[in-house]
């Protein structure tokens, strides 16, 4: 790809040390932007932990910035992260819900604290390695910015970005939105990035690769209680309701309990189906398609709409978890901070605390927190 000598302004790229943000920085420099790479440290604890890769990620990001030939800076947002993201994460788990901190991190840290910092550095835009696109359309009220799904639907991250607003989208560039992951890795190899084959990060950002129960146990009290079937039969003891999410199959500790069997005589798998916080009871059911695991509708709160106002009632697509295919649904009401969805086909393991995100084709409209 030839370099474009025409300067397009200053852009600060959030560089994590991974291949996506590294290629993002390179692409923008080739397009003629004055690029500044910024590494964000969002978690202070456990820097010496075997699970924490912050130091190596910082070294990787700095090395890439040097190779690409861009300015590189470091900022510590750990205090903001604990206050705006982690505290809410713990509150949600304490209430028996299963939050998605990456959604909140994007809205509060990567596209708020980071954006403010970048503007203070004299930037006109920020950029990240997210797989998504921004489109600006003219309306009678003026230009409106839309969040679109990425070209690579296997990597599309619009679900995690659905709480962004017009101001944030107006300042944001997503260079990878038109590329497939295979192309990104190919570019990284061609330009000699040492992290071209680096594994994508997985799991919740501040937990990393450590066992989830081990991490959560340090911050929330665990109160064991009964595991019951819908009929009230006790089939085990849970370690604390916070450690379980609806639809969970592994780690329930009820595998040896007899119950429904398949045609071949083997027992059907058990799934976490409901939580009763008042009684500290975890309900489990057998079979992936048990009625307790299926929901024909949902209610959501804390709604956030990218256009600044809710869409009209009507037919849309919705995701209730990342990488789920859009489920045909009807938006029945969207007033204030709440909305309701009715699905054409019942959805599996709709989980309170997760995000319900609404789409009109490739356009992400926004969403809310499932209750």
UniProtKB/Swiss-Prot annotation:
InterPro entries: MnmA-like, MnmA-like_C, MnmA-like_central, MnmA-like_central_sf, Rossmann-like_a/b/a_fold. Residues 100-102 are annotated as: Interaction with target base in tRNA. It catalyses: S-sulfanyl-L-cysteinyl-[protein] + uridine(34) in tRNA + AH2 + ATP = 2-thiouridine(34) in tRNA + L-cysteinyl-[protein] + A + AMP + diphosphate + H(+). HAMAP family: tRNA_thiouridyl_MnmA (MF_00144). The active site is at residues 105, 205. Catalyzes the 2-thiolation of uridine at the wobble position (U34) of tRNA, leading to the formation of s(2)U34. Residues 155-157, 321-322 are annotated as: Interaction with tRNA. GO terms for molecular function: ATP binding; tRNA binding; tRNA-uridine 2-sulfurtransferase activity. ATP binds at residues 14-21, 40, 129. Keywords: ATP-binding, Cytoplasm, Disulfide bond, Nucleotide-binding, RNA-binding, Transferase, tRNA processing, tRNA-binding. One of its GO terms (cellular component) is cytoplasm. The record marks 130, 354 as: Interaction with tRNA. Its main location: cytoplasm. Gene3D superfamilies: Adenine nucleotide alpha hydrolases-like domains, HUPs, Translation factors. It comes from the Bacteria. It holds the Pfam family tRNA_Me_trans_C. One of its GO terms (biological process) is tRNA wobble position uridine thiolation. It is found in: Cytoplasm. Disulfide bonds join 105-205. Belongs to the MnmA/TRMU family. Its EC number is 2.8.1.13. This is tRNA-specific 2-thiouridylase MnmA.
């Amino acid at each position: 790809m030839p370099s474009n000598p025409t300067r397009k302004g200053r852009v600060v790229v959030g560089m994590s040390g991974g291949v996506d943000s590294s290629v993002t920085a390179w692409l923008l420099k080739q397009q003629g932007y004055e690029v500044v790479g910024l590494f964000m440290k969002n978690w202070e604890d456990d820097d010496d932990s075997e699970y924490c890769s912050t130091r190596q990620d910082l070294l990787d990001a700095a090395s890439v910035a040097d190779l690409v030939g861009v300015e590189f800076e470091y900022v510590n947002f750990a205090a903001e992260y604990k206050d705006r993201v982690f505290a809410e994460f713990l509150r949600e788990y304490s209430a028996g819900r299963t939050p998605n901190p990456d959604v909140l991190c994007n809205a509060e840290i990567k596209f708020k604290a980071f954006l403010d910092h970048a503007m203070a550095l004299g930037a006109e835009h920020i950029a990240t390695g997210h797989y998504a696109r921004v489109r600006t359309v003219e309306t009678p009220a003026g230009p409106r910015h839309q969040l679109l799904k990425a070209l690579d639907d296997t990597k599309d991250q619009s679900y995690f970005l659905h709480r962004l607003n017009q101001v944030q989208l107006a300042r944001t560039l997503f260079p990878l939105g038109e590329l497939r992951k295979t192309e990104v890795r190919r570019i990284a190899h061609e330009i000699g990035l040492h992290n071209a084959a680096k594994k994508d990060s997985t799991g919740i950002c501040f937990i990393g690769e450590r066992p989830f129960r081990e991490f959560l146990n340090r911050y929330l009290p665990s109160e064991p209680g009964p595991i019951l079937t819908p009929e009230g039969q006790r089939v085990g003891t849970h370690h604390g309701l916070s450690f379980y999410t609806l639809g969970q199959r592994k780690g329930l500790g009820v595998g040896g309990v007899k119950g429904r069997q398949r045609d071949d005589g083997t027992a059907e798998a058990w799934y976490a189906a409901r939580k009763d916080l008042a009684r500290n009871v975890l309900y489990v059911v057998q079979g992936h398609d048990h009625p307790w695991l299926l929901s024909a509708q949902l209610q959501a709160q804390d709604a956030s709409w990218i256009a600044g106002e809710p869409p009209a009632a009507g037919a849309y697509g919705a995701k209730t978890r990342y990488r789920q295919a859009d489920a045909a649904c009807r938006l029945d009401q969207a007033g204030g901070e709440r909305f309701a969805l009715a699905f054409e086909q019942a959805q599996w393991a709709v989980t309170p605390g997760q995000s319900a995100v609404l789409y009109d084709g490739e356009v992400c409209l926004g969403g809310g927190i499932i209750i």
